[in-house]
Amino acid sequence: GAAQIFCSSLKVSGETADCQGWGCLPGYVEANKDILVRFTKALYKAMDYGSQEANYDEVAGYVADICGTDKASVLEQAKEGNWIDNKTLLQYLGDGTLKNYYETQQKNFIDAGDIDKEVPVEDYVLFDVMEEAGK
C-alpha cells in the first residue's frame, strides 16, 4: 500500500505500521481527560500547520534546532511523507483506518515475539479522546 506519514509520526506502509504517540497510565487518563483532550486539540493544530507545504521550511527550522541537525536534511525528509491535517486523521478515525493501523502494528509485535497476545487496541489507544478533541 501507499506510505502515509502523519504529523504525529504515524507511518504505515504495506503490511507494517509504525504508530507512535504519547503514552500515559490509566489513572492519569481517568483523572485528566480534559487535559488530554486539550493536548490533542493542540496536536491537531500543529498537524494542520505542519501539513501545509508552504510551512515546511519554517517547521524544518524548528525541528533542526530542537534535534541539533541541519535544516536541509530535515527538509529532505519532509519530502518522504504525506503529511495530513486533522480532518484527514479524523476521517481515518471514523472509517476505521486508524484502528486498522494499530491492529497491524500489534500483529507485527506479536509476529516478532515482542508481545504475547492480542488485546483490543481500544485498551491502549484513546480513540475517544481523539474524537472528542476533533469536535
Q: Where would I find each of the regions flagged by the language model?
A:
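Pocket-lining segment of extracytoplasmic ligand-binding domains
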Residues: 1-65
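An extracytoplasmic/periplasmic, membrane-proximal ligand-sensing/linker region
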Residues: 56-135
